[in-house]
UniProtKB/Swiss-Prot annotation:
GO terms under cellular component: cytoplasm
Family the entry assigns: Belongs to the uridine kinase family.
Keyword Transferase found: yes
Superkingdom in the source lineage: Bacteria
Pfam family, one: PRK
Species in which this protein is naturally found: Aeromonas hydrophila subsp. hydrophila (strain ATCC 7966 / DSM 30187 / BCRC 13018 / CCUG 14551 / JCM 1027 / KCTC 2358 / NCIMB 9240 / NCTC 8049)
Protein name from the UniProt record: Uridine kinase
Entries under Gene3D superfamilies matching the protein: P-loop containing nucleotide triphosphate hydrolases
Catalyzed chemical reaction(s): uridine + ATP = UMP + ADP + H(+); cytidine + ATP = CMP + ADP + H(+)
Protein EC: 2.7.1.48
């Protein structure tokens, strides 16, 4: 983590699916908006960069291993972050969890003073790590992550409990052990107890303020 002043601060939040990444990202976002203003901070989700699969049938899309780094278009994410650092706006893809592919719509995203980047595989890519000014890893027990994922995917993403459990056993847990957990070594800060860890939130906010003022 650098101590120099930054025109754009990028904070990376990684960890298992349903480990609390989105919660801590949203909490930091909402609290910093009150200090910096709505146009000064934004959140980018790695999920938006799942590859376009419109050329595949639905049956083929369902079989994709979404917990493997190859499922994500990190080339485009690196390109977009580099453009934002340079002061250029980008169009972020939108991804449909029900259609398992990108949508035709995009989300315009203007340069911000602070960008919070959250996703399961962010720390597996050295190019993304090099763009981050600070990175954290949500170190939440897998059994808790599974319970949260069941509730989220059934209630919010139209999944069945059986399909969620099968995916967890087939790809989610194995890919966590192969890719996500080993990437913890690259994190500047490891956060236990999920996204409601108040000490971690306050520490990250203080770090962001420090980098903004130099």
């Amino acid at each position: 983590m650098s101590d120099t002043q930054h025109s754009c601060v990028i904070i990376g939040i990684a960890g298992a699916s349903a480990s609390g990444k989105s919660l801590i990202a949203q909490t930091i976002y909402e609290e910093l908006v009150a200090e910096l203003g709505a146009g000064q901070i934004g959140v980018i989700t790695e999920d938006c960069y799942y590859r376009d699969q419109t050329h595949l049938t639905m049956e083929e899309r369902v079989k994709t291993n979404y917990d493997h780094p190859n499922a994500l278009d990190h080339d485009l994410l690196v390109q977009h972050l580099s453009q934002l650092v340079q002061g250029d706006a980008v169009n972020i893809p939108q991804y449909s969890y029900t259609e398992h592919t990108r949508m035709s719509e995009v989300t315009p995203f203007a340069p911000r003073r602070v960008i919070i980047l959250e996703g399961i595989l962010l720390l597996t890519d050295s190019r993304l790590r090099d763009l981050m000014d600070a990175s954290i890893f949500m170190d939440t027990p897998l059994d808790i992550c599974l319970l949260r994922r069941l509730v989220r995917d059934v209630q919010e993403r139209g999944r069945t409990m059986d399909s969620v459990l099968k995916q967890y056993q087939k790809t989610v847990r194995p890919m966590f052990l192969q890719f996500i957990e080993p990437s913890k070594q690259y994190a500047d800060v490891i956060v236990p107890r999920g996204g409601k860890n108040r000490i971690a939130i306050d520490m990250l906010k203080a770090r962001i303020r420090h980098m903004l003022i130099g």
